[in-house]
């Protein structure tokens, strides 16, 4: 089920989807992952009211254009090739390329310094991305940008009742700032979190809502995850790539929670 909540056309819109998520180990350290969707039924056709603000660049506020094409056949949500590499103990790299999410293609890499068993980690990521066309197959729009972030992680439930991630950098729309993410992972693997981003886009320029913020949850099921996030408003400032996962989450996935 793909919900779209609190649009100006109606409080709740949605789609009933058949969805396939797959991962293939092509060879050692090379993983190809895909996400395909097909809409059995949806009511996105009348999402016609344009966004009030598209500042500083339209990277997320045109979400309705993508949703309206959900009923036009198979949608490619992701088709991504990853190469994982550990050049030195505690130093981890991942190179990625392809269709990274529903709205962006691109190539990039992620680095993480993480010592096994440590409560701290630090890393950075850089991605050269291009906006996908609204049919969500292989075409692209004109918009391009390089987005990059320095990421700091802290996880110690003996001191804080939540995981903390702080990111500094440039977002998809070209604005710069900081994102604070607080989450809690439970012993069964379920994760709930909240986030907020504060960038060089002022609250007046941002408009209603003042800054980007939201909640999310990840629920493990049958060896995979149900992922969902919600923002009260879908705007462009503070927008980041919707990543399949990150190196830190992969490395601590099976670590006992202390």
Model segments located where?
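Transmembrane beta-strand segments that form the barrel wall of outer-membrane beta-barrel proteins
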Residues: 1-7, 32-34, 64-67, 89-100, ...
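Solvent-exposed loop/turn segments connecting transmembrane beta-strands
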Residues: 6-14, 28, 40-45, 71-77, ...
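Outer-membrane beta-barrel translocator/pore domains, especially the C-terminal barrels
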Residues: 133-137, 147-149
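Outer-membrane beta-barrel initiation region
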Residues: 1-81, 85, 138-145
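Flexible, glycine-rich linker and terminal segments associated
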Residues: 54-59, 157, 161-179, 185-258
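Feature captures outer-membrane beta-barrel proteins of Gram-negative bacteria and organelles
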Residues: 16-26, 52-57, 78-87, 106-126, ...
